[in-house]
UniProtKB/Swiss-Prot annotation:
Chief localization: virion
Cellular localization per UniProt: Virion
Function of the protein: Major capsid protein that self-assembles to form an icosahedral capsid with a T=3 symmetry, about 23 nm in diameter, and consisting of 180 capsid proteins monomers. Most of the 180 monomers are the major capsid protein, but a small percentage contain the minor capsid protein, which has a long C-terminal extension.
Source organism per UniProt: Beet western yellows virus (isolate GB1)
Listed name of the protein: Major capsid protein
Family membership noted in the UniProt record: Belongs to the luteoviruses capsid protein family.
Amino acid sequence: NTVVGRRTINGRRRPRRQTRRAQRSQPVVVVQTSRATQRRPRRRRRGNNRTRGTVPTRGAGSSETFVFSKDNLAGSSSGRITFGPSLSDCPAFSNGILKAYHEYKISMVILEFVSEASSQNSGSIAYELDPHCKLNSLSSTINKFGITKPGKAAFTASYINGKEWHDVAEDQFRILYKGNGSSSIAGSFRITIKCQFHNPK
């Protein structure tokens, strides 16, 4: 009986040792595959850090948008708006950020007329674009705003001498205007400019 008992005990222990050895060999394969999968995201993170490193190089310049108004325009008003260091209607531009850089360019200007005249009034306000600041008074009345209705005109860089950089000491362009109505208030101009600044001081 004891001999049979030993055989049955030994018979059971032998397959257990074999299964344990088989189980010990399996985790080795799993560990190798997990190491390979962990290395791939590390390479991607290094690539992301390189792209972020290029961001500070863009700090050499700045892009800004300014909105200002020219109020209390009479139906017979006339004048000019010079864009550059002479733009006194927008001190945040002329006396602010413009003094922090060596060069600038205005890439777009939007001229809007906000009517304040009654429907019984008549007349219009003509405007003209001077891309080289050579005109002192209006020379053409083709483009105009009726004083009883709102109007809008937009000019891109090619129309306002805005493709090249300008020294901050020189003006870029002008808008001249002249009305043919009465002396009563006709409305106001709402002006939006998109600017770029280069080479900080």
